[in-house]
Amino acid sequence: MLFNEHQKKAISYISGPCLILAGAGSGKTRVIINKIVHLIKICHFDPKCITAITFTNKAACEMKSRILNVLSVNVSNLVKISTFHALGLEIIKSEIELLNIKSNFTIFDEQDQISILQEIVSKEDRSFVRQIRQSISNWKNKLLCPNQVNKISNSSIEFKFFRYYELYNAYLKSSNILDFDDLIFLPTILLRDNKLSRERWNDKIKYLLVDEYQDTNFIQYKLIKLLSSKRSNFTLVGDDDQSIYSWRGANIHNFESLKHDYPNLRTIIMQHNYRSSGRILKVANALISNNLHFFNKKLFSNLDYGSIVEIISAKNEEDEARVILQTLMLHKSNYNAQYKDYAILYRSNYQVKIFEKFLIKFKIPYKILANISFFSRPEIKDLIAYLRLIINPDDNAAFLRVVNRPLRGIGAVTLQKLKEWSKKRNQSFFMASLDIGLESILPVHNLKSLQEFVYLIQTISYQIQLNPIEVLEKLVATIKYEKWLMRSLKFSKLYVASIKNISIVLNWIINELKYKIMNSKKFVMKYLIDIISEFILQNSLNEDIVINNDYVQLMTLHASKGLEFLYVFIVGVEEGVLPYYRNTTMENNIDEERRLAYVGITRAQKKLFLSYAIQRCQYGVVINTKPSRFLRELPQSDILWQKSKILNLNEKNNFLFKAYKKSLKKKLLR
């Protein structure tokens, strides 16, 4: 296997802290895989003492698959490849007694957080609740507990938010629930404050690799330091020019902190790009050179210099969508390309609607990569909430989610009285439903409905420990969920899709459980807890982009990171869109918008098109726009400015007919 000099250095250096500054398309995943192989085969590291951290489950699965191609199954399975949250969950389970958490805890996602904060805040609008959730998340990611926030609160609104943080934390504790932030917050606090735990995990992880270092936030960097505090044996791989997630807490200054905290840091810069033409890289380098840099880096390629970069000016967003798609069809016809070779990238999701209209009109097959997770679908959230409640009866959020799904005639007044009673008795909603005193405040039929639901959950919880697979296979029928969906959705496409989705998840859970209980049924509930936690963490059995099918692919610039396409269109390259209007006042924000444009440009392999509209409708008002400042920063000798051409009806029909005829001829020749 051939490597360039910088890749060789990156793979072989293990004598202390190492930063691999990996430019776009420089083969970073290949380097990480081969560094793991080098650690095992050449340096004789025990595979189970090597941990690699990625940011997504998809990236972790890809890395596992590629390691499997190089190492034997037995060896590759010992290497831990994980996300930060999955590793945090493992630490929590391992150190659960020190953390004073009950073993049947469940995990909250963002939607659950919003629902509970809505209860706590009471009568406040949803956008305000989202602000509170974000503040709590920010505090946890800065390692701040409620009492610490109280000390630094400088305004009445901060103090108010601190109180919500306090109440929210108390709710989590009483319900035996962790949110996503806790999965990193709790292990980091523990490793910081408990020397024995810190040493134990330093001995478990003797070499640490972290991918996408530019996406780390304050607490993740702190966790990296704690996990490697004994030996400083780590390799961090990232690119400061691709740091585009500050809105999610990513801190580009972690590069600066790294240089300061580790004076003996070895920095290896990989600049050789194996993806894009020389001209595309020249354009990308020129753009990003306008940012301040922690490191000097300039991408180069040994591939052809390539065709000119085209900038298309359109009258408005409709004209932009039309001309881009006509250009795409003509280009496809001229170069015998496939639709899957093309990507249309945009800054914000609202931009895609007009493109969808013309894609349908021109009969172009397409796929929009949306950031909607499989887990967020109502039927999946219901199923997981049932399982959470079966595992953990203290989970009040799960109780509220499913107590009336299917409908059981348990109204808002009944639930409010139950909440008040449970608070008075210091019990979960589940246990309060069984309290003998509840009959004094609830009508008989309401109490009966409530207790029948609780008895149903208790029965399933008991039976699942005896015959787990059979109980799970019959779960949807037992809770009468399918009948309820049938009545609600009346055999519509949505009903069919919902039943199919439930079946996918249940089959996945059943298969995982079958594998775990092959040797013993003794720990069924523990296994189920692990499986549900894993599913919630994955949060993405959603459809990924389908590379093998012949679709034009549309996605945001953020979603395009890590992907590559032969031909790329970046649309809406104008002031207020890219850069985004909210990010045009502060230099740091402009730098990130520029990095976002850079990420889009470096997705292209052979040909790049950029477009902007002279007028755009925003919030119902047509406004005049200006081409993005980023276009002026590109090397003008390498770009061609084009005006959109409005075809008359005959030209349009002739154009579409020629493209269709050529496409049909190609299909017949296959």
Curated annotation (Swiss-Prot):
<keyword id="KW-0347">Helicase</keyword>
<dbReference type="InterPro" id="IPR014017">
    <property type="entry name" value="DNA_helicase_UvrD-like_C"/>
</dbReference>
<dbReference type="Pfam" id="PF00580">
    <property type="entry name" value="UvrD-helicase"/>
</dbReference>
<feature type="domain" description="UvrD-like helicase C-terminal">
    <location>
        <begin position="278"/>
        <end position="562"/>
    </location>
</feature>
<dbReference type="Pfam" id="PF13361">
    <property type="entry name" value="UvrD_C"/>
</dbReference>
<comment type="function">
    <text>Rep helicase is a single-stranded DNA-dependent ATPase involved in DNA replication; it can initiate unwinding at a nick in the DNA. It binds to the single-stranded DNA and acts in a progressive fashion along the DNA in the 3' to 5' direction.</text>
</comment>
<dbReference type="InterPro" id="IPR000212">
    <property type="entry name" value="DNA_helicase_UvrD/REP"/>
</dbReference>
<dbReference type="GO" id="GO:0005829">
    <property type="term" value="C:cytosol"/>
</dbReference>
<dbReference type="InterPro" id="IPR014016">
    <property type="entry name" value="UvrD-like_ATP-bd"/>
</dbReference>
<keyword id="KW-0547">Nucleotide-binding</keyword>
<keyword id="KW-0235">DNA replication</keyword>
<dbReference type="GO" id="GO:0043138">
    <property type="term" value="F:3'-5' DNA helicase activity"/>
</dbReference>
<dbReference type="InterPro" id="IPR005752">
    <property type="entry name" value="Helicase_Rep"/>
</dbReference>
<dbReference type="InterPro" id="IPR013986">
    <property type="entry name" value="DExx_box_DNA_helicase_dom_sf"/>
</dbReference>
<keyword id="KW-0413">Isomerase</keyword>
<feature type="domain" description="UvrD-like helicase ATP-binding">
    <location>
        <begin position="1"/>
        <end position="277"/>
    </location>
</feature>
<feature type="binding site">
    <location>
        <begin position="22"/>
        <end position="29"/>
    </location>
    <ligand>
        <name>ATP</name>
    </ligand>
</feature>
<dbReference type="InterPro" id="IPR027417">
    <property type="entry name" value="P-loop_NTPase"/>
</dbReference>
<dbReference type="GO" id="GO:0006260">
    <property type="term" value="P:DNA replication"/>
</dbReference>
<comment type="similarity">
    <text>Belongs to the helicase family. UvrD subfamily.</text>
</comment>
<keyword id="KW-0378">Hydrolase</keyword>
<feature type="binding site">
    <location>
        <position position="275"/>
    </location>
    <ligand>
        <name>ATP</name>
    </ligand>
</feature>
<protein>
    <recommendedName>
        <fullName>ATP-dependent DNA helicase Rep</fullName>
        <ecNumber>5.6.2.4</ecNumber>
    </recommendedName>
</protein>
<dbReference type="GO" id="GO:0003697">
    <property type="term" value="F:single-stranded DNA binding"/>
</dbReference>
<dbReference type="GO" id="GO:0000725">
    <property type="term" value="P:recombinational repair"/>
</dbReference>
<dbReference type="GO" id="GO:0016887">
    <property type="term" value="F:ATP hydrolysis activity"/>
</dbReference>
<dbReference type="GO" id="GO:0005524">
    <property type="term" value="F:ATP binding"/>
</dbReference>
<keyword id="KW-0238">DNA-binding</keyword>
<comment type="subunit">
    <text>Homodimer.</text>
</comment>
<keyword id="KW-0067">ATP-binding</keyword>
